[in-house]
Each structure stands twice: as C-alpha cells, then as structure tokens.
Amino acid sequence: MTKQSIVIVLFAAIAMMACLQRVTAEPAPEPIAAPIAEPYANPEAIASPEAKDLHTVVSAILQALGKK
C-alpha cells in the first residue's frame, strides 16, 4: 500500500467516525402507535368488549397457521 492510499483510508475512517458520532448524538424519534392500536395499549383494555374482536382475529389466524 502506498502512502497516498493509507492517507485516503485514514481520512475515510475519520469521516465515517464523524458521521456515526453525529447520527448517534441525535435522539431517535418516539414510535407513534397506530390509532387503532391505542385502545389495546393498557392492561384494562384487554378485558374490554373491543378486545374480544381482536382475540377472535388472532385466534383465527393462529388456527389457519395450524397452531392452537
């Protein structure tokens, strides 16, 4: 490897490290739940009548996949 190649590789590594440092410094956005999923987010909602529909759908999918 020539000196020029080594210098180019070092500058590329420094640039990559600087970019990674900038990316990790920015906080990740908070995930936003879909409006339809929000009623099922708390434990009390699992016992609600609306949750029965969700349970029926999940059970049907699992049965279609051959699981109980």
UniProtKB/Swiss-Prot annotation:
<keyword id="KW-0929">Antimicrobial</keyword>
<protein>
    <recommendedName>
        <fullName>Venom peptide 3</fullName>
    </recommendedName>
</protein>
<dbReference type="GO" id="GO:0090729">
    <property type="term" value="F:toxin activity"/>
</dbReference>
<dbReference type="GO" id="GO:0050832">
    <property type="term" value="P:defense response to fungus"/>
</dbReference>
<keyword id="KW-0964">Secreted</keyword>
<keyword id="KW-1052">Target cell membrane</keyword>
<dbReference type="GO" id="GO:0016020">
    <property type="term" value="C:membrane"/>
</dbReference>
<feature type="repeat" description="AXPX 4">
    <location>
        <begin position="41"/>
        <end position="44"/>
    </location>
</feature>
<keyword id="KW-0399">Innate immunity</keyword>
<dbReference type="GO" id="GO:0005576">
    <property type="term" value="C:extracellular region"/>
</dbReference>
<keyword id="KW-0027">Amidation</keyword>
<keyword id="KW-0677">Repeat</keyword>
<keyword id="KW-0800">Toxin</keyword>
<feature type="repeat" description="AXPX 1">
    <location>
        <begin position="25"/>
        <end position="28"/>
    </location>
</feature>
<comment type="similarity">
    <text>Belongs to the MCD family.</text>
</comment>
<feature type="signal peptide">
    <location>
        <begin position="1"/>
        <end position="25"/>
    </location>
</feature>
<keyword id="KW-0472">Membrane</keyword>
<feature type="repeat" description="AXPX 2">
    <location>
        <begin position="33"/>
        <end position="36"/>
    </location>
</feature>
<feature type="propeptide">
    <location>
        <begin position="26"/>
        <end position="51"/>
    </location>
</feature>
<dbReference type="GO" id="GO:0044218">
    <property type="term" value="C:other organism cell membrane"/>
</dbReference>
<keyword id="KW-0295">Fungicide</keyword>
<comment type="function">
    <text>Antimicrobial peptide with strong activity against the fungi B.cinerea (MIC=5 uM) and C.albicans (MIC=33 uM), and no activity against the Gram-negative bacterium E.coli (MIC&gt;200 uM) and the Gram-positive bacterium S.aureus (MIC&gt;200 uM). Shows cytolytic activity against insect cell lines. Has no hemolytic activity against human erythrocytes. In vivo, peptide injection in the vicinity of the head and thorax of lepidopteran larvae induces feeding disorder that lasts one or two days before recovering.</text>
</comment>
<keyword id="KW-0732">Signal</keyword>
<feature type="repeat" description="AXPX 5">
    <location>
        <begin position="47"/>
        <end position="50"/>
    </location>
</feature>
<dbReference type="GO" id="GO:0031640">
    <property type="term" value="P:killing of cells of another organism"/>
</dbReference>
<feature type="modified residue" description="Leucine amide">
    <location>
        <position position="65"/>
    </location>
</feature>
<keyword id="KW-1053">Target membrane</keyword>
<feature type="repeat" description="AXPX 3">
    <location>
        <begin position="37"/>
        <end position="40"/>
    </location>
</feature>
<keyword id="KW-0204">Cytolysis</keyword>
<dbReference type="GO" id="GO:0045087">
    <property type="term" value="P:innate immune response"/>
</dbReference>
<keyword id="KW-0391">Immunity</keyword>
